[in-house]
């Protein structure tokens, strides 16, 4: 009787152990929604897709990335709020978009601060540059890394050869006091508008121009509705990849390391794409014959 009872207990324990193991193996993967506002063929779009691929590879499927391009999920003006609410887990807004959360990153909006992307790299890889990734910690956000898009150019409805040519023109800008002051300094009227509305605003002549990289000007077809582009390289358009502190710390140590490794490789890939696309898209715009 005692032997039979012991065997039953052992059998039950074995069955429970097997069941627990099966449940653990069948646990749902962690879902990571990555939201961005640009096309998939841009540096950010290609980086996000590479990140999705590498996370699947490095985590063995324990973390699954879903990418939402072209403002399908959120625009940059709403995504950080959504992130803090847990509706999205990762994004890469332009550095100008963080002005509601910190003043530190406004430095990147200053015109003619960087000569080229090499000088940007030197700063971002410095102790000060890396320290700026922590500027959002008190707001519940974690900066994970920088991504280039490129140097900004000016597109407009009339030629811009000297600063005075911008006088009286309406330019779309991101929400940034620095960018606002930049255009006001040359007599232009800056208007803060979402990126997703820029093409329509240009097409309907609600605005006269905008500033952007070669990649965005080409991928969003701004060159089709703007007869003039001035190669000014006057400013930088970079992004910061961010997540919420709650989501980041909710990953296991192993998952966090794997996702971080995937991101670093993806950012290196994306930055190379940014370099190549600046050259390629500039030439495609020139070859189109639509702009001067």
Residue positions per predicted region:
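Positively charged n-region of N-terminal signal peptides that target proteins for export
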Residues: 1-4
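N-terminal secretory/targeting leader peptides
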Residues: 11, 26-119, 127-292
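C-terminal segment of classical bacterial N-terminal signal peptides
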Residues: 14-24
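Short beta-strand-centered segments that line the small-molecule binding cleft or hinge
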Residues: 122
């Amino acid at each position: 009787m005692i032997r039979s009872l012991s065997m039953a207990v052992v059998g039950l324990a074995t069955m429970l152990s097997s069941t627990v193991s099966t449940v653990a193996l069948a646990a749902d993967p962690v879902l990571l929604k990555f939201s961005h506002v640009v096309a998939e063929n841009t540096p950010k779009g290609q980086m996000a897709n590479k990140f999705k691929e590498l996370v699947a590879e490095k985590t063995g499927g324990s973390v699954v990335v879903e990418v939402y391009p072209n403002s399908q999920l959120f625009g940059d003006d709403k995504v950080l709020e959504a992130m803090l609410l847990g509706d999205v887990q990762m994004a890469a807004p332009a550095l100008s978009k963080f002005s509601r959360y910190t003043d530190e990153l406004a430095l990147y909006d200053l015109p003619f601060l960087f000569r080229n992307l090499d000088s940007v790299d030197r700063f971002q890889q410095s102790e000060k540059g890396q320290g700026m990734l922590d500027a959002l910690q008190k707001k519940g956000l974690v900066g994970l890394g920088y991504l280039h898009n490129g140097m900004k150019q000016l597109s407009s409805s009339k030629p811009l050869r000297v600063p005075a040519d911008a006088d009286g023109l309406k330019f779309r800008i991101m929400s940034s006091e620095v960018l606002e002051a930049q255009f006001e300094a040359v007599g232009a009227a800056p208007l803060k508008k979402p990126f997703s509305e820029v093409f329509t605003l240009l097409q309907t002549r609600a605005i006269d121009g905008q500033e952007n990289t070669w990649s965005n000007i080409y991928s969003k077809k701004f060159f089709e509705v703007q007869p003039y582009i001035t190669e000014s390289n006057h400013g930088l358009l970079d992004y910061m990849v961010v997540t919420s502190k709650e989501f980041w710390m909710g990953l296991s140590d192993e998952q966090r390391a794997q996702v971080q490794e995937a991101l670093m490789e993806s950012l290196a890939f994306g930055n190379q794409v940014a370099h190549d696309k600046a050259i390629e898209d500039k030439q495609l715009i020139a070859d189109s014959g639509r702009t001067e």
